[in-house]
Design a protein with these regions (language model features):
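Juxtamembrane intracellular "pre-TM" segments in multi-pass secondary transporters
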Residues: 2-25, 206-246
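Helix-loop boundary and gating motifs at the non-cytosolic
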Residues: 13-73, 241-282
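Helix-to-loop junctions at the C-terminal end of transmembrane segments
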Residues: 78-89, 174, 292-305, 391
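Cytoplasmic helix-loop-helix junction between adjacent transmembrane helices
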Residues: 123-159
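Glycine-rich segments within core transmembrane alpha-helices of 12-TM secondary carriers
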Residues: 152-170, 373-383
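Helix-loop junctions on the cytosolic side of multi-pass membrane transporters
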Residues: 199-216, 414-425
Length: 426
């Protein structure tokens, strides 16, 4: 028995996902390990956020309007995210975004009961865009490029493990109804994000590139740095590899926004399933993704991006067709939709993020990420209102729209080139 345990422990230590944490101490390991402080409360809330608004009289069109308004605000914050990441450092900017964008916003969500408070909370949450750029830089800038897919896999795993807490929210909703349970969860979310901010302060350090950029921009004004985007934009538009990676990111950003916002309404209002099931769908999704990421992901050659991405997008399209063809009350087909979507996400999510980062100039990563993020949100912003309007006409239409998006992404993926071997090979 002792020999078997020792052998199992040795195999665990030799697993590529364990090795990537051992080879990348400091920021990557710290940020991966504290990600559940965001992931647990977020996934407890995720199935019920739209219903929380709907139960308090917020209409489909108002939900879509909130999405579109906040996307416009997110564009503004995204532009400044790159500048603040350079001037204040990746670490401090990450902390700033976590505190204002999550800890503060969640307190407002906890007391929201009308359109204006929900809009205020959503706008406050836009501060989170400031730290998106900084967080990605803090995570990967001191990491080895060949480890990026596995690092992003760990980020996904951190969120997936948190999903197994989701049944608790389902049980409480069944006992006490949506509104009071979600209010308490938002308050707890605020507390965990305060803790995450403090841990980041204690255990993370500024990256080497962050120190260089902070020194280079110390004397530069914010407005001067904004003006420098005029030189970055033409360079970005001339880089076909980056443009293709950005196109895929934009398409998937919109598709994720649509499915996250309207799935709960679709299965409860159109298919007639109980809202108590909403907490269990993410568990199936997480279980499938975890099995895939831990047991299969590392067996796929790290240098291969195009084929896994294309297969993942095809699976997304198949999943949407299953959902659209599901008759009322068909729990089994909804579970099949979740299962296939999870396989698709496990293939797509780590690779699309790693592909984009490997395409960027490391010296300008912060501002390029900020520019790309702002562009992604700007291009996506009209679709919040559009899909809200489509849902008000027929709750199937947002998912028909998603099907078109996945087919378009497959066309783009067919034209990308693999990243350089020295960056991707394990």
């Amino acid at each position: 028995m002792h020999a078997k345990l020792k052998s199992a422990f040795q195999r665990l230590r030799a697993h590529p996902l364990v090795q990537v944490l051992a080879n990348n101490p400091g920021n990557p390991r710290t940020l991966v390990l504290i990600e559940p402080l965001w992931g647990i409360p977020y996934n407890l809330l995720a199935p019920f956020t739209t219903l929380y608004m709907y139960a308090q009289g917020i209409t489909d069109v108002q939900i879509g309007l909130i999405l579109s308004i906040t996307m416009v605000v997110q564009v503004f914050f995204s532009f400044f995210g790159g500048i603040l990441s350079d001037k204040l450092g990746r670490k401090f900017t990450t902390m700033l975004g976590d505190f204002l964008g999550w800890a503060t916003a969640c307190l407002v969500w906890a007391v929201s009961n009308n359109f204006w408070l929900f809009l205020l909370a959503a706008v406050l949450n836009c501060f989170e865009q400031i730290n998106q750029t900084a967080w990605y830089c803090l995570l990967i800038e001191d990491a080895q490029p060949k480890d990026l897919v596995n690092i992003y896999t760990w980020v996904n795993i951190g969120g997936l493990v948190a999903i197994f807490f989701a049944p608790l929210s389902g049980l409480f909703v069944s006992a006490y109804s949506v509104v009071p349970v979600v209010r308490v969860l938002y308050f707890l979310f605020s507390l965990t994000m305060v803790a995450k901010t403090l841990i980041t302060f204690k255990f993370c350090r500024e990256t080497r590139q962050g120190q260089i950029r902070r020194a280079e921009t110390r004397q530069a004004s914010v407005f001067h740095m904004l003006g420098e985007y005029r030189q970055l934009i033409p360079r970005l538009l001339q880089d076909k590899a980056v443009l293709k990676a950005v196109a895929v990111s934009v398409i998937l950003y919109i598709a994720n926004m649509v499915s996250t916002t309207f799935f709960s309404l679709y299965v409860t209002q159109r298919l007639g399933l109980s809202e108590n099931y909403l907490a269990f769908f993410p568990i199936l999704n997480a279980a499938v993704m975890l099995v895939f990421m831990v047991g299969i992901q590392h067996r796929l050659h790290a240098a291969s991006f195009r084929t896994p991405l294309w297969i993942g997008l095809a699976l997304y399209a198949i999943a949407v067709m299953v959902l659209l063809l599901s008759p009322a009350g068909s729990l089994g087909l909804v579970l099949l939709y979740v299962f296939v979507s999870a396989m698709a996400a496990a293939l797509v999510n780590p690779r699309k993020d790693a592909l984009l980062q490997l395409s960027l100039n490391a010296e300008e990563r912060a501002r390029l990420n900020a520019l790309i993020m702002a562009s992604t949100i700007a291009l996506s912003s009209p679709f919040g209102y559009l899909t809200g309007w489509l849902s008000s006409l027929d709750r199937r239409l947002p998912f028909v729209f998603n099907l078109v998006l996945f087919l378009a992404a497959m066309l783009v993926i067919g034209r990308i080139q693999e990243p350089p071997a020295e960056h991707a090979e394990a």
